[in-house]
Design a protein with these regions (language model features):
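Short, well-ordered alpha-helical segments
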Residues: 40, 79, 83, 113, ...
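Conserved interaction-surface patches within small, structured recognition/assembly domains
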Residues: 73-109
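Signal for well-folded cores of large energy- and translation-related assemblies
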Residues: 47, 89-94, 120, 124-127
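Glycine- and Gly-Pro-enriched alpha-helical subdomains that act as flexible
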Residues: 98-101, 108-127
Length: 127
C-alpha cells in the first residue's frame, strides 16, 4: 500500500492589516480555515466586531490544490473587492485560508480602480 502526503501552503494563525485610502479605512483579517462553515463562523465574528462598517467583502480558498474558492463583493461594484482579495491569496499559493475585509466609508467615492487597489492592498497587508 502506498500513501501520498499532500503538501500545501497556508497561514498558521490570524493576522490583520489596515489600509487607508482617502478617508476610507479598510481592515483585513486573514485566518486559516478547514471548511466553508468555519470561514462563515469566523467572518461573522469579525463582522460583528465592526458593526459600523459599510461593507464586509471576502475570499477564501480550500482544497489541497486550492481548487475550491469563493469571493464576495458585499454590495461593492462587481469584481472590485472579493476578486482582488482572492488574487492576493492566490498570488501566495495559499489554500485553507480566508481573508475578510471591512470598509469604513470616508465620504469619498474611490471608483472601481481605487476599490480594486484598496481591497487588494488591505488583503496583502493581512497576509
Amino acid at each position: 500500500m502506498t500513501m501520498s502526503i499532500e503538501r500545501y501552503r497556508t497561514v498558521t494563525g490570524t493576522s490583520e492589516g489596515i489600509h487607508r485610502e482617502l478617508a476610507s479605512k479598510f481592515i483585513a483579517r486573514a485566518f486559516p480555515i478547514a471548511n466553508e462553515a468555519e470561514f462563515k463562523r469566523i467572518a461573522e465574528r469579525f463582522g460583528n466586531e465592526h458593526p459600523a462598517s459599510r461593507h464586509m467583502c471576502y475570499a477564501w480558498v480550500l482544497g489541497d490544490a486550492g481548487d475550491h474558492h469563493r469571493a464576495n463583493d458585499d454590495g461593492e461594484p462587481s469584481g472590485t473587492a472579493g476578486l482582488p482579495i482572492l488574487r492576493r491569496i492566490r498570488s501566495l499559493d495559499l489554500t485553507f485560508c480566508g481573508v475578510a475585509v471591512v470598509r469604513y466609508f470616508g465620504g469619498t467615492l474611490l471608483g472601481k480602480p481605487g476599490l480594486i487597489q484598496a481591497y487588494g492592498e488591505a488583503a496583502r497587508l493581512a497576509l
